């Protein structure tokens, strides 16, 4: 049975002594003693990781801390995971969290006095300090931050402390915790949790995105030139936004038929847009030059997905431009990026064997001890003992950023053993730049999830996994900004229609439940596949962009019967990227499951890729 505990996951260096904790909230103690840190120290991660100090303070009169929720028993506890708490301390922490969630401070205080292992005391204190029923003072908050600035609740405690800061009070230790990020890998890498400026950063990103979508390019550049924008987002993210805005401006010019002169200094995305415009006009020489600029972009300015796309299309454009000597070299360069869409297509076209190393790091004794000896890893192991998997994943993800490869391997091994595929993918993405130094990286990036659809699979596992990996990164609690739910990111209206028309056996089911969500998702996939003659490109595009948009693109895109040109011409960035990533996921999961990849053969031969059921023991598509 789930026990939901509101608060910023519990935590406290400012916990009061047992007798003081027994006092009522209306009569708080004068000054709480500091709880001791666990004996373990962090050796896997670089010491003293800098934390940016916020420059914008929230308004005191309106600040309310956004307290996360910790759930105990939200997942079965895996019996043979490494542990750090004995049974007595584990059960005592459970009672403390439950008592504090109910505002039973005296009962919680009595249990706190008996705690021997201090591993989760940071969580206990944060639960109290962030409770709406507890008037935390500035000195308490400052003391907690001094002990636990690396804690997941540190950003919320920091913001609350800023709002309650008094003249002459102790200096605050900035929060150093780096949490989950959203967006493309390049934008995610540029972002950190910046404490007080996080709301301002989110507002700026929303404004910039609206300007890009509405054609307000000049206004966007003016906003990016402001010092306050650079202070809030940081110079790296500002440069990424400049590239994105310039690309959108060039796209608008291309759609109006304006030819943009070749510039070496253009961002790769901008050259890509101009190259595709030249290709569709039939100017293969210009297209080849542009695609070569994309392929030759330095790795710090372009992802492996961009580089492989530039190389693949440079090969194709050069062949059509009468430069056959450049075809094979650029195609081989595309194939170097083995898990990308164009990398896989290039490998297939060259007749190369697609054989990633699927072995995942084993959680042996050495790696278990490494986690126990790390401050973050120790907290995560204790949380897993309580069944608090979401909180544990936050800790492990944060601890793996910029970590030693051996520590990352330990986290990936734990994710595999604890059946946490979402953690595995997120940790892998966070360590993409050092992937060649991490054993079992490819296997960790494409985990086999532990869930099954209610009633079993009616669509191949590889395709369902491919959509899940892209839609939610295997996070069953994922919710998009527009309300899409769960593993398959179903919109509420879509879930209702699918449940009533195509999956009546799921009537009354909870769409957040993994098995129900997967059942509804695969039923929707089956409907989409049936509507486009099993065309995988149009199915993926319809799942993300909507079937109506697919019908419009079929009528307006100048792609003929060229599936690769069709994909590259999809006007919505998100949908274009989605199609490529889902298909790449699908093919890689087929390889991992020991299945052939007929749709990859088809697209490499410039034919439309079509779904062919291969999980014969799992049934066939409805």
Please identify what each model-predicted range represents.
Residues 21-89, 170-201, 210-214, 232, ...:
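Compositionally biased, proline/threonine/alanine/serine-rich low-complexity intrinsically disordered stretches
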Residues 90-104, 194, 198-219, 248, ...:
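Alpha-helical segment of the N-proximal tetratricopeptide repeat
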Residues 93, 126, 159, 205, ...:
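TPR/TPR-like alpha-solenoid signature
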Residues 99, 132, 165, 211, ...:
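Residue at a conserved register position within TPR or TPR-like alpha-solenoid repeats
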Residues 102, 131, 214, 249-252, ...:
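Structural motif corresponding to the intra-repeat A-B loop/turn of tetratricopeptide repeats
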Residues 118, 126-128, 135-151, 160, ...:
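Catalytic glycan-binding domains that act on GlcNAc-containing polysaccharides
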């Amino acid at each position: 049975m789930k026990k939901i505990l509101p608060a910023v996951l519990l935590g406290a260096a400012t916990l009061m002594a047992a007798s003081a904790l027994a006092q009522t909230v209306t009569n708080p103690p004068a000054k709480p003693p500091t709880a001791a840190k666990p004996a373990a120290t962090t050796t896997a991660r670089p010491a003293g990781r800098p934390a940016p100090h916020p420059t914008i303070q929230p308004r005191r009169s309106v600040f309310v801390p956004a307290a996360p929720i910790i759930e105990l028993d939200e997942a079965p506890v895996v019996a043979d995971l490494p542990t750090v708490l004995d049974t007595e301390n584990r059960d005592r922490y459970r009672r403390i969290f439950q008592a504090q969630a109910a505002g039973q401070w005296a009962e919680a205080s009595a249990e706190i006095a008996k705690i021997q292992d201090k591993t989760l005391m940071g969580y206990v204190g944060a639960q109290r300090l962030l409770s709406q029923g507890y008037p935390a003072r500035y000195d308490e908050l400052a003391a907690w931050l001094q002990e636990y600035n690396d804690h997941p609740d540190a950003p919320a405690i920091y913001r609350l402390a800023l709002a309650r800061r008094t003249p002459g009070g102790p200096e605050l230790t900035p929060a150093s915790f780096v949490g989950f990020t959203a967006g493309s890998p390049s934008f995610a890498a540029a972002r950190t949790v910046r404490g007080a400026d996080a709301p301002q950063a989110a507002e700026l990103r929303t404004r910039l995105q609206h300007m890009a979508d509405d054609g307000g390019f000049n206004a966007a550049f003016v906003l990016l030139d402001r010092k306050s924008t650079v202070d809030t987002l940081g110079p790296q993210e500002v440069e990424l936004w400049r590239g994105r805005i310039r690309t959108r401006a060039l796209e608008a010019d291309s759609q109006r038929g304006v030819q943009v002169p070749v510039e070496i200094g253009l961002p790769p995305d901008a050259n890509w847009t101009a190259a595709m415009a030249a290709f569709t006009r039939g100017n293969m020489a210009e297209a080849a030059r542009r695609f070569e600029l994309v392929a030759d972009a330095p790795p710090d300015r372009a992802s492996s997905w961009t580089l492989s796309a530039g190389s693949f299309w440079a090969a194709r454009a050069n062949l059509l431009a009468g430069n056959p000597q450049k075809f094979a070299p650029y195609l081989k360069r595309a194939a170097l990026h083995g898990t990308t869409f164009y990398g896989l297509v290039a490998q297939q076209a060259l007749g190369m064997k697609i054989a990633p190393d699927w072995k995942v790091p084993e959680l042996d004794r050495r790696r278990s001890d490494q986690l126990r000896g790390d401050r973050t890893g120790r907290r995560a192991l204790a949380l897993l003992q309580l069944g608090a998997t979401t909180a544990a994943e936050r800790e492990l993800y944060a601890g793996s950023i910029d970590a030693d490869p051996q520590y990352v391997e330990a986290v990936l091994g734990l994710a595999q053993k604890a059946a946490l595929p979402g953690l595995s993918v997120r940790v892998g993405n966070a360590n993409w730049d050092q992937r060649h130094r991490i054993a079992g990286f490819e296997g960790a990036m494409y985990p086999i999830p532990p869930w099954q659809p209610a009633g079993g699979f009616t669509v191949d596992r590889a395709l369902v996994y491919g959509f899940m990996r892209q839609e939610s990164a295997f996070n069953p609690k994922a919710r998009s900004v527009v309300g899409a739910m769960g593993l398959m990111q179903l919109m509420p209206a879509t879930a209702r229609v699918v449940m009533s028309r195509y999956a009546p056996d799921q009537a009354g089911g909870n769409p957040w439940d993994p098995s129900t969500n997967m059942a509804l998702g695969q039923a929707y996939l089956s409907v989409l596949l049936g509507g486009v003659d099993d065309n995988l490109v149009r199915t993926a595009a319809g799942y993300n962009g909507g079937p109506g948009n697919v019908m419009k693109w079929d009528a307006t895109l100048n792609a003929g019967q060229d599936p690769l040109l069709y994909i590259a011409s999809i006007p919505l960035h998100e949908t274009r990227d989605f199609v490529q990533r889902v298909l790449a996921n699908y093919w890689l999961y087929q390889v991992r499951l020991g299945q052939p990849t007929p749709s990859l053969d088809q697209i490499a031969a410039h034919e439309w890729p079509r779904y062919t059921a291969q999980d014969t023991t799992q049934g066939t598509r409805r």
